[in-house]
A protein has these predicted regions:
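Charged, flexible boundary elements
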Residues: 1-10
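Aspartic protease core domain of the pepsin/retropepsin superfamily
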Residues: 17, 25, 29-112
Length: 112
């Protein structure tokens, strides 16, 4: 396997099994494509309003639809995580960013 391949896992989001979850240490926040909202048992009315604008790697900016908190379970680790919900056609079903990675202690964090 190439070291340049992305890391996709299968996890549980608020009790729902979800595959193609991307772990991305380059992302400051965790993202949930809007199309996944109902699949994890949530409704657009559950979103907390936000002024966050997400900018992707190409520089395109998209206003977030809102925030939703989901319980993320990976192995024996379980943590409530705030996801920024965005309109997206991404190939992943959820993205776990540095907020989640460091929150579960998956990678030690050091400021240089």
């Amino acid at each position: 396997m190439s070291h340049l391949c992305s890391l996709h896992i299968t996890t549980t989001l608020s009790g729902i099994r979800v595959n193609k979850v991307l772990i991305d240490g380059g992302a400051a926040i965790s993202l949930l494509p809007e199309r996944m909202l109902r699949k994890v048992g949530k409704h657009p009315d559950d979103l907390v309003p936000t002024n966050i604008v997400v900018t992707d790697f190409s520089g395109t900016s998209t206003p977030a639809r809102g925030l939703v908190t989901l319980t993320v379970k990976v192995g024996s680790s379980e943590r409530n995580t705030v996801f920024v919900v965005v309109p997206s056609r991404a190939s992943y079903n959820a993205l776990l960013g540095r907020d989640w990675i460091h929150g579960v202690g998956a990678v030690p964090f050091a400021v240089h």
